[in-house]
């Protein structure tokens, strides 16, 4: 899909946050400071401890044998997670620890390179691949306290080869191996989600065609005034599934919006965080929700995440699945649309909660 014309977008000066903390460690530029209403209500520390344990955890080893009680119990947990939270963590997912640690190490090495080296792979205004900040469309738009490096991975035609770095030397090999593992995980998860919706297990894979997969590495440096900034603006994802890997010993940074309150999600060792994207919300006719989420920063600790977005091929027409629509009891909530058109719409606007999904809603 073609990016927006670069000449039509004026984004102003975008400071690199890693360079900021080197030169002015105790100063937060005005363009990063959020209005008080943007910071929202965060669940209290007492409730946070309780809610950490309410974030659903799905044990994928229990879904390997479909004929036992564990399977049906875990499918029920998965259904409730998708319906009530839109987020869950998966354990025993089958991806080797060495694969996970290697991509973390490579990503860390990339962000540690000199700025001049990273600037060889720029994220141009109106695009979402390369190094920099995405979703910036005006000179007065507030910035996130984050550096990003994003790449299209699969199918090959969505890649921009000029943006795949030559350093670190094993970057491409590591990302290829990791992405293959995550792709297989997404296929498995979609089978289980289909079963949880009462669909045949291959329903999503048959409909998606050659699925689109992209990766974004996010680096959140420490911030001297974390209460004034956001690491990543509130948004839902345009994907079908999103897989979040948080670096080892990561501080709490992800927050999800539940009952109008921001709930921190505590990382579990060797777990991956999965969230439902807008595409699954549409396909399930709103039964499973894509949930607004954001990232916050820490005064003392850095945070590194690796995010994979998995979605249907751009040529696929998306609409609520007929099995999940009933004219009387559950009428169609979303119109039919081309997934490529929605993807273009999503990346052509700044992150604003769930506003992007208005593109597909049927307004009564």
UniProtKB/Swiss-Prot annotation:
Keyword Endoplasmic reticulum appears in the UniProt entry: no
Q: Which cofactor does it need?
A: Fe(2+); L-ascorbate
Q: What is the effect of changing residue 253 to D?
A: In lbo-2; increased shoot branching associated with reduced activity toward (11R)-methyl carlactonoate and very low conversion to (11R)-hydroxymethyl carlactonoate
Q: Where in the numbering of this chain does the Fe2OG dioxygenase domain appear? A: 203-312
Per the record, the gene is: LBO1
Keyword annotations for this protein, in alphabetical order, are:
Cytoplasm, Dioxygenase, Iron, Metal-binding, Oxidoreductase
Q: Which reaction does it catalyse?
A: (11R)-methyl carlactonoate + 2-oxoglutarate + O2 = (11R)-hydroxymethyl carlactonoate + succinate + CO2
User: What quaternary arrangement does the UniProt entry report?
Assistant: Monomer.
Main location per UniProt? cytoplasm
Name of the featured protein: Protein LATERAL BRANCHING OXIDOREDUCTASE 1
Question: Which tissues show it?
Answer: Expressed in the vasculature throughout the plant and in the buds and root tips.
Q: Known EC number(s)?
A: 1.14.11.-
Task: Write down how the cofactor binds this protein.
Answer: Binds 1 Fe(2+) ion per subunit.
Q: Where in the cell is it found?
A: Cytoplasm
Instruction: Give the free-text miscellaneous remark of the entry.
Output: The branching phenotypes of the lbo mutant can be rescued by exogenous treatment with the synthetic strigolactone analog GR24. However, the lbo and lbo max4 mutants do not respond to carlactone (CL).
User: What is one Gene Ontology biological process annotated in the Swiss-Prot or TrEMBL record?
Assistant: regulation of secondary shoot formation
Deletion consequences? Increased shoot branching associated with an accumulation of carlactone (CL) and methyl carlactonoate (MeCLA) as well as reduced responses to these compounds, substrate and product of MAX1, respectively. Accumulation of carlactone (CL), carlactonoate (CLA) and methyl carlactonoate (MeCLA), 16-hydroxycarlactone (16-HO-CL), hydroxycarlactonoates 3-HO-CLA, 4-HO-CLA and 16-HO-CLA, as well as methyl 4-hydroxycarlactonoate (4-HO-MeCLA) and methyl 16-hydroxycarlactonoate (16-HO-MeCLA), compounds related to (11R)-hydroxymethyl carlactonoate (1'-HO-MeCLA).
Could you name the domain of life of the organism this protein comes from?
Eukaryota
Which InterPro entries does this one have?
DIOX_N (IPR026992), IPNS-like_FE2OG_OXY (IPR044861), IPNS-like_sf (IPR027443), Oxoglu/Fe-dep_dioxygenase_dom (IPR005123), Plant_2OG-oxidoreductases (IPR050295)
Residues reported to bind Fe cation: 235, 237, 293
The top EC class, named as a word, is: oxidoreductase
- State the GO CC annotations: cytoplasm
Query: Which PROSITE patterns does its entry note?
Result: FE2OG_OXY (PS51471)
Source organism: Arabidopsis thaliana
């Amino acid at each position: 899909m073609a990016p927006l014309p670069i000449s039509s977008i004026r984004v102003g000066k975008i400071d690199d946050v890693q360079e900021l903390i080197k030169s002015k460690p105790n100063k937060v530029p005005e363009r990063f400071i959020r209005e008080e209403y943007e910071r929202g209500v965060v669940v209290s520390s007492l409730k946070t401890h309780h809610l950490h344990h309410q974030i659903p955890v799905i044990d994928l080893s229990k879904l390997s044998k479909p004929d036992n009680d564990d399977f049906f119990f875990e499918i029920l947990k998965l259904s409730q997670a998708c319906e009530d939270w839109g987020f869950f963590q998966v354990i025993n997912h089958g991806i080797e620890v060495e694969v996970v640690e290697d991509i973390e190490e490579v990503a860390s090495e990339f962000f540690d390179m000199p700025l001049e080296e990273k600037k060889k792979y720029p994220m141009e205004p109106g695009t979402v691949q390369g190094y920099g900040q995405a979703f910036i469309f005006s000179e007065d738009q507030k910035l996130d306290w984050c550096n990003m490096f994003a790449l299209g991975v699969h199918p090959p035609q969505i890649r921009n080869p000029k943006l795949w770095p030559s350093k670190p030397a094993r970057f491409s090999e590591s990302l290829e191996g990791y992405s293959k593992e995550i792709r297989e995980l997404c296929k498995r998860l979609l089978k289980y989600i289909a079963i949880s919706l009462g669909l045949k297990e291959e329903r999503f894979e048959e409909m998606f065609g050659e699925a689109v997969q992209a990766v974004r590495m996010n680096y959140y440096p420490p911030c001297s005034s974390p209460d004034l900034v956001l690491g990543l603006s509130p948004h839902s994802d345009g994907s079908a599934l999103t897989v979040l890997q948080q670096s080892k010993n990561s501080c709490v940074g992800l927050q999800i919006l539940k009952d109008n309150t921001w709930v921190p999600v505590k990382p579990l060792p060797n777990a991956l965080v999965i969230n439902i994207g807008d595409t699954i919300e549409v396909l399930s006719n709103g039964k499973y929700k894509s949930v607004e989420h954001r990232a916050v920063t820490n005064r003392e600790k850095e945070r590194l995440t690796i995010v994979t977005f998995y979605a249907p091929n751009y040529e696929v027409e998306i609409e609520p699945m007929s099995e999940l629509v009933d004219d009387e009891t559950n009428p169609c909530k979303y119109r039919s649309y081309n997934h490529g058109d929605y993807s273009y719409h999503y990346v052509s606007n700044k992150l604003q909660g769930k506003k992007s999904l208005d593109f597909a809603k049927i307004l009564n």
